[in-house]
């Protein structure tokens, strides 16, 4: 899918188990010209990511069945995915959490609730960086 300026639209994988948050993230990103691939179950995230070849991965850290941190670490070891920056989002932003998330390999971090302004600023910074 091409944007109006002729460039290919950036592809963003959204891994979020909360249906409302996942839809909100995808709707906001689509409204800004991005192509999104929503993933509700973290167990499917790596396979979907490999098939989708995202320019950016937005990763919820608290997922049922698998840790978002484990998924980030696995993505960073994957030859196909390791170049894709990861923006981690979490509702549990305690002391030391950001360090653990960055140690896992995430290039960006936002605490929930996520506002649209900071989300878009982080997305653009990671895609342009």
For each predicted feature, which ranges?
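Active-site beta3 strand of CheY-like receiver
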Residues: 52-58, 63
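Short hydrophobic/Thr-rich beta-strand motif most characteristic of the beta2 strand and flanking loop
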Residues: 33-40, 48, 110
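The feature encodes the CheY-like receiver
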Residues: 64, 73, 82, 94
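Charged docking surfaces used in two-component/phosphorelay signaling
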Residues: 23-31
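C-terminal output helix
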Residues: 26, 114-123
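Acidic catalytic/metal-coordinating carboxylates
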Residues: 20, 41-44, 67-73
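Conserved acidic carboxylate
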Residues: 16
């Amino acid at each position: 899918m091409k944007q109006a300026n002729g460039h290919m639209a950036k592809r963003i994988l959204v891994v979020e188990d909360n249906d409302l948050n996942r839809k909100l993230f995808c709707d906001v990103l689509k409204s800004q010209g991005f192509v999104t691939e929503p993933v509700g179950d973290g167990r499917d995230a790596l396979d979907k990511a490999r098939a989708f070849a995202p320019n950016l991965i937005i990763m919820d850290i608290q997922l049922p069945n698998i840790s978002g941190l484990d998924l980030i670490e696995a993505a960073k070891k994957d030859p196909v995915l390791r170049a894709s920056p990861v923006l981690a989002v979490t509702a549990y932003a305690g002391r030391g959490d950001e360090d653990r998330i960055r140690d896992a390999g995430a290039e960006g971090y936002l605490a929930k609730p996520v506002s649209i302004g900071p989300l878009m600023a982080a997305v653009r910074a990671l895609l342009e960086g």
